[in-house]
Amino acid sequence: MLTNADREQIIAQYQRGESDTGSPEVQVALLSARINDLQNHFKAHKADHHSRRGLIRMVNTRRKLLDYLKGKDLGRYTTLISQLGLRR
């Protein structure tokens, strides 16, 4: 589970302005951190199907945000993908 300190660190790393918390880069970075955290959870709890549904929903939301960013600004998209280590 992400702590508030982790969340603030991610926001500070990917924000575009002083008080930016809603840009696609920040949203994708936060979703990626939550997805990675849940993947570690599933290594220990293989039968947790309820949380798996939430994981799939987060992955789909992240994919939609990445598609939006790719159409809006390809440079920001490629930078974000390389920073997060996502394969697309």
Curated annotation (Swiss-Prot):
Gene Ontology MF annotations: rRNA binding; structural constituent of ribosome
Look up the record and give one Gene Ontology term from the biological process aspect.
translation
Q: Does the keyword Ribosomal protein apply?
A: yes
User: What do the Gene Ontology cellular component annotations say?
Assistant: cytosolic small ribosomal subunit
Q: Which UniProt keywords apply?
A: Ribonucleoprotein, Ribosomal protein, RNA-binding, rRNA-binding
What Pfam families has UniProt attached to this entry? Ribosomal_S15 (PF00312)
Per its UniProt record, what SMART domains does this chain match?
Answer: Ribosomal_S15 (SM01387)
Q: What does this protein do?
A: One of the primary rRNA binding proteins, it binds directly to 16S rRNA where it helps nucleate assembly of the platform of the 30S subunit by binding and bridging several RNA helices of the 16S rRNA. Forms an intersubunit bridge (bridge B4) with the 23S rRNA of the 50S subunit in the ribosome.
Family under the similarity heading = Belongs to the universal ribosomal protein uS15 family.
Q: How does it assemble?
A: Part of the 30S ribosomal subunit. Forms a bridge to the 50S subunit in the 70S ribosome, contacting the 23S rRNA.
Q: What is this protein called?
A: Small ribosomal subunit protein uS15
Whose protein is this, by species? Psychrobacter cryohalolentis (strain ATCC BAA-1226 / DSM 17306 / VKM B-2378 / K5)
